């Protein structure tokens, strides 16, 4: 790695900082980011090696929000990433990050990774501020052998969330992913590839109380405010989520995806929630998720300075929740049934474009996009549900200006809007006024239009015999229900 870094610094010294950054932060590469899900496609990721280290801080304040996710967060992020060409046919890459965050006003959720495990969360009506630490690292290796390319990547992330006052929630997660891919050059630069992924996820969470003056009631939620009354109200509730997931796909491309690519992937996962408050363990729910994804893109050169691209994609996800029923004999619980009681279907179709104009001292890139999404969510026992149909459209822009051989300024404004085409409320009351109010508030949030404006500004500069430094700032405002949610962030770092 040290040899690779030394080579990188020498190579970048021979180029202007502008050309180095244009390659390192290629907007076209970001446009076809999903193409690199197959690690065997990383051979065309970059024409040169690069590395980056940065530290950032952000403050996100939300006036309109989903209570189970909190009203924003603030905290520190430290991250590093690198892509190294060890030899013409051998590449390695990796990244690592650490976050220390504080999330405010989390309510009706005493778990992490809500979108992954919902609706089977542990919840109470009090909640509070949440401290969260995240660790993540990943590493990949690629080898070219004549017409064959073989590559693999391993990534691991872990979280710890906790609260230092009642209800004293503590949750830890671990997420291991192993990716592998193979591609074969069938003719000239046309390639066919296959890839696969294995994922193992675990979450352990508990809620404890120290106050002698009383405590809130804890629910084992099962969707739309309904809960598992047999396991509700524990004095020291503790749960485990365990998930195994598999995914595989195929890929066809030309010129390492720079001319065109097409890929399809399908996957399945199974997440089981168990109760382990006592010495006994009981399965509470099982959440199965089946996914299917399609994406294709085509790129064109127009004259010498113009580059065009168009991409279209489709994705489908169907989550099915099964719930366990037990006897009421408190001396010894025994399973009576397992039945499907929840389903969530999510279908998305998208199209986006790319236009890039390049000169020796500046580049302009525009990426417009449009997306159509349909979400249907319902449960049985009792019947309840909701449906949303959304349209999204927006524009991401990037302007990079060379000030001198050692100074570059980058300006990235963006805009997007979510429009609710249809929303259907078929919710049933849970019989608890506080719970019903939360469920209705959550529905109204999802049934609201959202308009977002933001911009990123970054200044890179290089001093003699030192790596290049950068400072950056970001601001975003989001309008929802006639109120504004605001985000501000700043970062500093080095590239080499």
Give the predicted meaning of each segment.
Residues 45-51, 88-94, 146-152, 188-192, ...:
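Outer-envelope beta-barrel architecture signal
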Residues 78-84, 137-143, 178-184, 248-254, ...:
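Residues on the lipid-exposed face of transmembrane beta-strands in outer-membrane beta-barrel proteins
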Residues 14-17, 188, 484-496:
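Outer-membrane beta-barrel "beta-signal"
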Residues 55-61, 98-102, 143-147, 156-160, ...:
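Transmembrane beta-strands of outer-membrane beta-barrel pores
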Residues 226-368:
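Long, internal scaffold/assembly segments composed of regular secondary structure
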Residues 107-121, 164, 195-242, 270-284, ...:
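Short, flexible helix-coil linker/hinge segments at the edges of structured domains or between repeats
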């Amino acid at each position: 790695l040290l040899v690779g870094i030394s080579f990188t610094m020498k190579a970048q010294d021979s180029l202007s900082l502008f050309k180095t950054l244009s390659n390192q932060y290629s907007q076209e590469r970001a446009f076809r980011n999903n193409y690199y899900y197959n690690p065997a496609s990383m051979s065309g990721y970059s024409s040169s090696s690069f590395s980056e280290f940065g530290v950032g801080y952000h403050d996100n304040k939300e006036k309109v929000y989903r209570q189970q996710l909190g009203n924003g967060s603030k905290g520190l992020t430290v991250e590093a990433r690198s892509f190294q060409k060890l030899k013409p046919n051998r590449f390695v890459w990796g990244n690592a990050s650490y976050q220390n965050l504080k999330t405010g006003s989390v309510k009706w959720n005493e778990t992490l990774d809500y979108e992954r495990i919902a609706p089977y969360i542990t919840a109470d009506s009090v909640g509070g501020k949440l401290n969260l630490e995240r660790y993540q690292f990943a590493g990949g290796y690629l080898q070219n052998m004549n017409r064959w390319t073989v590559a693999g990547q391993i990534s691991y992330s872990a979280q710890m969330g906790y609260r230092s006052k009642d209800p004293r929630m503590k949750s830890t997660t671990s997420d291991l992913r192993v990716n592998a891919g193979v591609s074969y050059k069938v003719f000239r630069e046309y390639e066919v590839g296959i890839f696969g992924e294995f994922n193992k996820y675990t979450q352990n969470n508990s809620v404890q109380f120290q106050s002698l003056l009383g405590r809130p009631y804890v629910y084992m939620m099962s969707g739309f405010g309904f809960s598992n009354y047999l396991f509700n109200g524990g004095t020291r509730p503790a749960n485990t989520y365990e998930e195994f997931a598999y995914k595989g796909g195929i890929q066809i491309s030309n010129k390492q995806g720079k001319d065109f690519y097409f890929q399809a992937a399908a996957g399945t996962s199974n997440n089981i929630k168990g109760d382990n408050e006592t010495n006994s363990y009981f399965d509470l729910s099982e959440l199965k998720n089946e996914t299917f994804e399609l994406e294709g893109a085509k790129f064109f050169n127009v004259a010498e300075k113009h580059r065009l691209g168009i991409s279209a994609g489709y994705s489908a996800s169907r989550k099915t929740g099964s719930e366990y029923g037990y006897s009421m004999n408190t001396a010894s619980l025994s399973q009576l049934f397992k039945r499907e009681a929840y389903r969530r279907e999510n279908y998305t179709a998208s199209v986006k474009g790319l236009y890039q104009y390049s000169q020796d001292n500046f580049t302009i890139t525009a990426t417009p996009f449009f997306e159509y999404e349909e979400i249907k969510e319902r449960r049985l026992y009792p019947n309840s549900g909701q449906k949303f149909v959304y349209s999204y459209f927006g524009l991401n822009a990037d302007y990079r200006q060379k000030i001198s051989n050692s100074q570059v300024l980058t300006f990235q404004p963006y805009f997007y809007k979510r429009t609710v085409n249809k929303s259907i409320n078929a919710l049933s009351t849970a019989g608890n006024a506080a719970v019903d109010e939360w469920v209705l508030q959550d529905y109204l949030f999802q049934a609201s239009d959202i308009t977002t404006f933001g911009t990123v500004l970054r200044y890179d500069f290089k001093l003699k015999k030192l790596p290049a430094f950068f400072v950056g700032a970001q601001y975003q405002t989001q309008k929802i229900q006639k109120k504004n949610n605001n985000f501000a962030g700043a970062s500093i770092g080095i590239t080499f």
